Amino acid sequence: MPNNESTQTTVDEILNVDEDNDEDESNIFEKPWLLEIDNVPDANRIVGRDDHITFLAKNLRKMRTNSVPDNVLEWGETGTGKTLVARHVCERLEAATEGTDSPIVTAYINPDPISTYTSTFRKIAEQVNAKAENPLEVPYQGLSAEHYRDQKLWPVVQREFSGGLVVIIDEIDKHGEVNEVLYTLSRTQSKDDVDFPVITIGISNDIEFKGEIESRVQSTLQPEHRTFTPYEEDQLIAILENRRDAFYDGVLDDEVIPTTAELAAEEHGDARRAVRLFRNAGEIADEEGDDIVTAEHVHEADELVEVELFMEMVKGTPLSGKLLLFALTRLDRNNPEKEWFRTSEIHEVYQTVARDVKVEPKGYNRALELLNKHVTTGVLESKKKEGGDQGKFRSYSLQGDVESTRTGLINSTPELQTLMGW
């Protein structure tokens, strides 16, 4: 039987911080916040995106001159600077108009597969009120989307941010009701009778999602499309050099930045991955008590990053969706010669996994729907086979490494931890 008192003592020792003990201070990181994924750096740390920054700044400046800015849709693979550019320019816009007669407010929404039309407007209202001097209370539930807008959002913008509202919606392809959201935002001035501009910046990693935006939305939104290309290896090096001061002087081996950039460049020039690798390598060195961060630490970090990225991709996924992915990893492990598995095969193993963790399995059609959502988010690939003796059927394949996917699922899903050895 485990000794709970001993376990509690160990936890307390880990959590305790002795301000007079130098051992509690990192010998590696001086400014760790520079490596946080959500950190929006100063302009002099941003690399290779001057044209996009200039375009967006000039476009949004129209809000200050009674002109009508364009709505914007940004396209490009993960880690190409889309979110960074949008958030950087919007932060500067808020700062530039603060204290003027027409301040402008911005909201940033990062949806997941379970985001709804109503929850999106609640989140926008929450963020706007959080920045207001005299905020309104925004209840978490119980109101319609129209009520959130008409009673909790537009009155506050009108009263305190008469220059207008800019809404950034990240990863629009993950939002199940994004067409309705974009349509409503694009018709705000005509339909909701407000006299301030409401501008939308939509961001997507999936260029093919353009075809999923309904024609009525395209017609009212009339967006300016901006395409972000992957970073080159030398640009990734510059991005990391601009964050070198996150570390103490002298702790980075000369090979760390080139190795990190090279690994990130292999993954379509992903700056987000590069910064995460950079940070994780430092954390590994710190945890191991090393005084120098080396290329070996970077390679160790590379394995961990795969798991972290996967956990981000499935964040917000319902339990059944995760169990289906776990079933697919089990099929992959047991059939190393196969890459593609039919829906019926996955569903059969999924039913076993669900019962193993004491969850009632979903039916075939719901499983198919969940698998297709994973295709939308890039976790899975799918293909359809028609004709032949077996008729029509759909097959699925994991996009990422099987073991990283499996580890990420176990780490993010308590119900699966009992199956760790399976």
Curated annotation (Swiss-Prot):
Matching SUPFAM superfamilies: P-loop containing nucleoside triphosphate hydrolases, Winged helix' DNA-binding domain
Tree of life domain: Archaea
Family matches, as CDD domains: Cdc6_C (cd08768)
Pfam families reported in the protein's UniProt record: AAA_22, Cdc6_C, Cdc6_lid
Binding-site residues for ATP, renumbered to this chain: T80, G81, K82, T83, L84, Y231, R243
Biological process according to GO: DNA replication
Gene Ontology molecular function: ATP binding; ATP hydrolysis activity
UniProt xrefs under InterPro entries: AAA+_ATPase, AAA_22, Cdc6_C, Cdc6_lid, ORC1/CDC6, Orc1/Cdc6_arc, P-loop_NTPase, WH-like_DNA-bd_sf
Sorted UniProt keywords: ATP-binding, DNA replication, Nucleotide-binding, Plasmid
Family affiliation: Belongs to the CDC6/cdc18 family.
Function: Involved in regulation of DNA replication.
NCBIfam families linked to this entry: orc1/cdc6 family replication initiation protein (TIGR02928)
Protein name (database record): ORC1-type DNA replication protein 13
Species the sequence originates in: Haloarcula marismortui (strain ATCC 43049 / DSM 3752 / JCM 8966 / VKM B-1809)
